[in-house]
UniProtKB/Swiss-Prot annotation:
Belongs to the TUB family. InterPro entries: Tubby-like_C (IPR025659), Tubby_C (IPR000007). Residues 1-46 are annotated as: Disordered. This is Tubby-like protein 8. The lineage of its organism: Eukaryota, Viridiplantae, Streptophyta, Embryophyta, Tracheophyta. It comes from Arabidopsis thaliana. Mostly expressed in roots, flowers and siliques. It holds the Pfam family Tub. Residues 1-16 have a biased composition (Basic and acidic residues).
């Protein structure tokens, strides 16, 4: 009993102390309320309202527990839940502040600055001349009338349809130019005049217009004739006089044969064959000059051992353009874009069908690019391309 009395006495003493403390606090609050200005009261009310609004927003979760509210919302939930600011967001915010502060002052480094010297490499690449071709040192007459040396490789030329000069107004004129490359001057090798006699095509080839007007001129090179259907073209040399009578004999250099148009379920395309005389290959560095183009034997139809046969490559069918096309990607980057045409062709030897010996591609309405190599001469390649350009009755496309 004595212990319980002591506990009760302690409780009563504590209650008295608490009453005195609460009384003093209430008097202090009363004094504070009297000294508070109306502005402080209004601000305290506003802060309380803001706290209540934040608490109500934080209690919208399904769990009922308050969550921390920040200004960064989730991109995946559409802002329904609030996320804590990450280090990436902090970096983005800092960068945006830097960009805004430096707006209007940040500029790109100009091309002419010292730090962009590496870009200036391309400014002069197009103006520099292309390296000289291996055949560029050959004279015009040798490049035109003699077989191209074996070690020269491929020679590139352009065929251009031009306006007829005075005295040649009833036909078409084609010129043969070398394609030396960018930054180099092209050379004019030959000019050809096309006319028809009794419906048959005749081409006369010379180095200039004077040779076209007079076949006895030194610049005259030769001629090419065709049959009525245009299925066979004969390439002739300029000819020599034989015997005391002085009869003119024109050696036959090559023959071009066109087969009738081949029609398939995917379309139609042309096919051609070329016959050349066999000859020994010559090197450019040989002490002797490059040899003259050989002549076909008189019995070239029967004597097949002395002739070389070239056939045109079969074009592939393009499903997008719905026409037959040839692949000219092996030409490399020459700056000339070849258009699809039925007059385009690629000739290969029967012994080496993978290597293209002569090819022609249309560049535009009046220009064609050709590439030829041994055993062709420039004159033979020029005439074969003119035969493909010429219109024919045997070809319906």
């Amino acid at each position: 009993m004595a212990g319980s009395r002591k506990v009760n006495d302690l409780l009563e003493e504590n209650k008295g102390n608490v009453d005195t403390i609460t009384g003093s606090l209430s008097t202090q609050k009363g004094e504070d309320k009297e000294n508070v200005s109306p502005e402080k009261v209004s601000t305290s009310v506003e802060t309380r309202k803001l706290d209540r609004a934040l608490k109500s927003q934080s209690m919208k979760g399904n769990s009922g527990f308050p969550t921390e509210v920040t200004n960064f919302k989730s991109f995946s939930t559409g802002g329904r839940t609030a996320l804590k600011q990450s280090s990436l967001q902090a970096c983005m915010q800092k960068n945006s502040e830097v960009d805004k502060s430096s707006f209007g002052m940040k500029t790109w480094t100009s091309v002419d600055s010292e730090h962009s010297s590496s870009l200036k490499v391309w400014e002069f690449s197009d103006s520099e001349a292309a390296p000289a071709s291996s055949w560029s040192t050959l004279p015009n007459r040798a490049l035109l009338c003699k077989t191209l040396p074996l070690d020269v490789g491929r020679c590139t030329c352009l065929i251009v349809k031009e306006q007829s000069p005075e005295g040649l107004s009833h036909g078409s004129v084609y010129s043969l130019y070398t394609h030396e490359g960018r930054g180099r001057k092209d050379r004019k090798l030959a000019v050809a005049y096309h006319s028809r006699r009794n419906g048959k095509s005749i081409f006369r080839v010379a180095q200039n217009v004077k040779g076209l007007l007079c076949s006895s001129d030194e610049s005259y090179v030769g001629s090419m004739t065709a049959n009525l259907l245009g299925s066979k073209y004969y390439i002739w040399d300029k000819g020599v006089r034989v015997g005391s009578v002085g009869k003119m004999v024109k050696p036959l250099l090559s023959v071009v044969i066109f087969t009738p148009t081949i029609t398939t379920w995917t379309g139609s395309y042309r096919r051609m064959r070329t016959l050349l005389p066999k000859q020994q290959p010559m090197q450019k560095n040989n002490n002797k000059q490059v040899q003259q183009a050989s002549k076909l034997p008189l019995d070239w139809l029967e004597n097949k051992e002395k002739i070389q046969k070239l056939c045109s490559r079969i074009p592939h069918y393009n499903k997008i353009s719905k026409q037959h096309e040839l692949d000219f990607r092996d030409r490399g980057r020459t700056g000339l874009r070849i258009q699809s045409s039925v007059k385009n062709f690629q000739l290969t030897l029967t012994e080496t069908p993978r290597q293209t010996i002569l090819q022609m591609g249309r560049v535009d309405k009046a220009r064609y690019v050709i590439d030829f190599r041994y055993p062709f001469s420039g004159y033979q390649a020029f005439c074969i391309c003119l035969a493909s350009i010429d219109s024919k009755l045997c070809c319906t496309v």
